[in-house]
Amino acid sequence: MIQIKLWQGRFSKDTARIFDEFNASIMVDINLFEYDVMGSVAHVKMLSKCDIIPEDEGKLIVNTLYEILNDFKEGKIEFDMSDEDVHMLIEKELIKRIGQVGKKVHTARSRNDQVVLDERLFCREKNLYLQELIKNLIDTIIKLAEENIDTIMPGFTHLQKAQPVLFSHYILAYAQMLKRDLLRFRQNFISINLNPLGSAALAGTTFDIDRFFVADQLEFDGVTENSIDTVSDRDFILEMLFNIAMLQMHLSRLAEDFIIFNTDEFRFIELDDAFCSGSSIMPQKKNPDALELIRGKTGRTFGNLIGLLTVLKALPLSYNKDMQEDKEFLFDSIDTAEKSLIIVNEILKTLKVNKENMLLACKSGFINATDLADYLVTKGVAFRDAHFVVGNIVKYCIENNKSLEELSTEEFKRFCDKIEEDVFKFISLENCIKRRKSYGATSPELVKKQIENLKEFLRAYE
């Protein structure tokens, strides 16, 4: 007869029901079911290889584990709080099906190293998927930039018009952020892809196991080096949570920009109806809810990172039950990041860019004032003096309700006699853009270079 709890031999009474409910993690870590089976299969194959269990029993266990996995995928495995966690659920199901032989599956293993294995397998798969989603989004941004290679818009500092830039240059800034995100996830993959199994509870095992065989079976790059550290380590999860928080911060900034640019006050872009919603009372409203949710859910990913850091901050070595709390943080952040990346990608694919409104916005706000100062520098004026002169010119324009382009040469000369007729060509928006040729700047030729560099990065990325 199968015991209710597989570890209850040392206890003389049942645990309190309220504690069972408090202790159970099955409703959360059920998400690790497939990874737990994969790990158990590799572990049992190793036990057979090392003559720790007979070969025929090993095959029976492996075949039964696959049957259990198939039944789980078909919704045939029932579970509740009494199963405690996914590891106990699978082992109890195995014993129920093949009896005494099933009890050998946990030889030379602890739930302490077992759960780390499951989490590493899960994180590895999700890490690779997130990398693909990020690459897809970078590719979409590149295409959007190419479609708007010459579109001029105001660049902003302090949410005030600053200097003219190309929309392609602006949107590629987010591609660069995502590129850094991608590289962080690749580095995180290195931390993830190590086999922890064989560390057992904390001190390793007395059985003559082969950890490298398990690593090979599960396509890990190697094994962890210290069994105490292995069962205590959640750094790879923290790295993933940080990477997701950073990624979401980037997506949230894009969302904020687009929410602003989509308003009637800006009308730089128009979001597709598929990613907006209406109001229950105001029939005219088209709200950018998808972007607002990305912005809002970003806070959850920050909270998940801080939550796990707080759980781990004062834990003594090695394993402690506190670590059970890591999964909700992890699952929630990954789910948020996956959906956010997919939604932002679709928003960009369906985005309408209002080029005329962007250009019109550049006609006000003295967006070419820096170029006027640069013009004076070319005439031999020290930049700080040029800055002061242009500040006075802008003040004059504001007082007289004029733009820089509307001033006459004579008016310019009141402030500096070195200003000539050629100033108007110098401060035209098109020339303001074209002259910015420092590497990484907003001129069309350099933006095209940025695009080509990003394309080459994606082609070479592995």
UniProtKB/Swiss-Prot annotation:
Gene Ontology CC annotation, any one: cytosol
Domain of life according to the entry: Bacteria
PROSITE patterns, A to Z: FUMARATE_LYASES
Cellular localization per UniProt: Cytoplasm
Alphabetical keyword list: Amino-acid biosynthesis, Arginine biosynthesis, Cytoplasm, Lyase
Pathway in which the depicted protein is active: Amino-acid biosynthesis; L-arginine biosynthesis; L-arginine from L-ornithine and carbamoyl phosphate: step 3/3
Protein name: Argininosuccinate lyase
Origin organism lineage: Bacteria, Bacillati, Bacillota, Bacillota incertae sedis, Caldicellulosiruptorales
Gene behind this protein: argH
